[in-house]
């Protein structure tokens, strides 16, 4: 699998595997910024595999729509993550645990980047295996005091 990063739309016409004369599946990552990008890439045969990230897709609802489109069009997907808090890591872990990912995600322990993360229990890997809690919501408790301490801007709806 070859992962292409930040391949702008104006270059997408160069992505067709037939033109490259390679058999390696093309995985798009940062190039897919939402459902419309994914739909375009599928329609024009520019994608073999998708690396999906909730934040890049625009939230959980568009991510769900993208996963459903991948399933309908038989495009394998896998779940990636970035430097992010345990809340986002747990969301990505829950998505990766759906069971039909193409391959293991590039997830890491939730306490990897922050000395005091926002969730309990931490998302951890033991011997390469991720334990995903099955409680309500994401299955973890959010430390409200830590969230408040890290908050830069707050909006009340």
Residue spans of the language-model regions?
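Catalytic core of soluble alpha/beta enzymes
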Residues: 1-88, 114
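Flexible C-terminal active-site loop/helix
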Residues: 83-157
């Amino acid at each position: 699998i070859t992962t292409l990063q930040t391949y702008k739309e104006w270059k997408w016409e160069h992505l067709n595997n037939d033109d490259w004369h390679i058999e390696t599946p093309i995985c798009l990552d940062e190039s897919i910024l939402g459902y419309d990008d994914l739909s375009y890439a599928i329609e024009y045969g520019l994608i073999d595999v998708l690396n999906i990230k909730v934040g890049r897709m625009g939230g959980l609802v568009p991510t769900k729509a993208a996963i459903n489109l991948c399933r309908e069009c038989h495009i394998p997907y896998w779940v990636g993550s970035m430097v992010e808090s345990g809340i986002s890591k747990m969301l990505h872990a829950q998505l990766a645990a759906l069971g039909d990912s193409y391959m293991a995600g590039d997830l890491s322990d939730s306490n990897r980047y922050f000395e005091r993360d926002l969730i309990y229990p931490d998302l951890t890997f033991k011997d390469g295996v991720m334990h995903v809690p099955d409680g309500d919501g994401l299955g973890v408790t959010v430390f409200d005091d830590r969230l408040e301490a890290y908050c830069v801007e707050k909006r009340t709806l």
